Every structure is written in structure tokens, then in C-alpha cells.
Amino acid sequence: MKSLLRYFILFIGLILAGCSSDKVKVGLLIHSLDKERWQSDQKYFIESVNELGGKVLVAVADNDDQKQLQQAQDLLKRKIRTLVIIPVNQYSAAEIVDLAHNHSVPVISYDRLINNSRVDYYVSTDNIKIGELQAQYMTQLVPKGNYALIGGSEYDNNSRMLFLGQMNILQPYIERGEINLVYRKFTKYWSEDEGYQMAKECLAQNNNQINAIIAGNDAIAYGVLRALKENGLEKKVAVAGMDADLRNVREIVKGNQVMTVYKPIKTMASTAAEIAVKLARGEEIDGCNTRVSNGKRLVPSVLLEALPVNKDNIEQTVIAEGYLKAQDVYQ
């Protein structure tokens, strides 16, 4: 009887050991958690990896690219099998990719493409299309007048993609003399304070004669709204953003912001999680729908479609998707 019990305990131990070894470690490097949307990305990514039987090791760089490099080194020492990066800097993060590859660890660039690197996969939305969605909505609402573009970080490839999309729509209006692009600048950190300061500068330079402002994201847009309010221009200037942050969707309900763009964050995060775990287990990757050039290679990519959000479709978009709750939006 004791012999049978001993073999039974040994058998259970082997099963548990096998389960433990299958719980692959995935590293997640996040540039910052200062905006609510990145907190959602982190939450959904961790949940998805856990459901797939993996474990996530997270490090947040607080917008410091050297700190992010050090964090990558630390995670690699902890024997991660795949590294997912939301880069602080789209250029300097190439060093992290090389470092990971030296440890035979594949890298997924999440939402922001790492340029001039051998990054293995890219998961994001079509940011050119997002820029087009912003500009299409604005030109339908404000087909003539003075426009300002306050873009995202100068270090982020997404900012350039958004601008290209915006200009695809705006350029014909500009050439016909219907729209004047009187202000265009990129921020450093996609921040509310930068949006506020640049909007103040834009208004001062143009004697408050601005008809539309397209912001790189909702944090920037919120800063723009602050500047407009200070100058008595609430609801007089059309403002667009991106990310469908709760406070901005509330401003859309109030009529202060005209639209935002919602990225399907839950799907993005779960897609990245699935690829990360498959890479860690040496499984075949499928589902990539395009390849995107980063200056060094055509990166196998999954680009998801974003949704424009305005006061008429909030319930059919961000609420239906489960991203925001009706009781939070309609206070």
C-alpha cells in the first residue's frame, strides 16, 4: 500500500512539473501607464496570456528609453521566452530587439512599430486609416476654414502614419484653397499638457481664428479643450482625438469634442498574447494579414480596423464593445 502511495505521489509530481514547465514566461515592456488606454492594454494582455497558460512579467519605463533598455536586460535574465514591447522611442528600441535576439528571444512590437530593426511581429491598427477617419469626419463637419494638426510623439512611428492619413484627405481641400493648414506640430509625449500649450500657441498665432483641430490622441485633445475653454471657444472649434478615453467621450456627449477613434484594444491585446505564447512554445504563427516596412524589413503584421466614435454612435461602438460603461459615460 505504501509503495502504491509513493508511486501515486511521484505520478502527481510529474504532472505538476509538466504543467509548471508549460507556463511560459512572456515579457511585457510598457512605455508608460499615464493614460487609461495603456492600463486597459496591460489588463487585457495579462488576462489573455494567463488564459493561454502563460505568465506575464511586466516593466513600465515611465517614458525613459534608457530605463526601458535596462528593464529589457532584467527581463531577459529572468528567462522570458517572448518579449512584447510598447517602445518609448521607435528608433532606440531597435537596441532592445538586438539584445533579445542575442538571447534567442523573439520580439513583438505592440501598437508602435520599432523602426530599423529585425523585430519579428507587429500588432496594431491601421494608423493611416485612423488619420483618414479623423480628417474625413472633420471635413464633412468643417469643409472650409483654418485647420491645426497637433500630432503625437515625434519619436513614435504612429504619429507619422496618422499625419499621412490626415493629409490624404486634407490635401485636396488645401489645394483648392478651401482649407488652410495654419499650424502643425508634433508633441514629445502625447500628453495633455503639450496639447494645452500647443493649442494656446496656435490660437495666439492666429488671433483665435481656428475652425478645426485634429489631435493625435485624446490626451492631447483634452489639453486642446482646456485651451479653448480659457479663450471662450468651447463648441466653436471642432476637435477630434483618438483612443476613446472616458473623459473625452463624456466631452463628446457634451458637444465639446466632435469625435474620437476607438482602437479595438481587447482584440489587439488578445492577438498579441496569442502570438507571444505561440512563439514561446515554438508553434506556427498564423493570422498575419499584411507586412509593414520598418526600414530594415517587411514585418509580418496584424493590423486591426479602428472605429470612429461620435455622439450618435457611442452606444453602438465603445459601449457595445464593452470598453466603456453607459453609466460612466452618461453621468
State what each model feature region is.
Residues 27-29, 79-87, 106-110, 148-151, ...:
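Periplasmic-binding protein-like
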Residues 91-129, 136-140, 146-152, 245-253, ...:
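Flexible loop/hinge segments that line or gate small-molecule binding clefts
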Residues 2-10:
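Sec-dependent signal peptide recognition
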Residues 20-22:
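Bacterial signal peptide processing site
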Residues 87-101, 166, 188-251:
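Hydrophobic alpha-helical
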Residues 16-18:
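C-terminal motif of bacterial Sec signal peptides marking the signal peptidase cleavage site
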Residues 154-158, 170-171, 271, 275-331:
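Hinge/cleft segment of the Venus flytrap/periplasmic-binding protein
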Residues 29-42, 58-67, 88-89, 112, ...:
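Hinge/beta->alpha junction and helix N-cap segments in small-molecule ligand-binding domains
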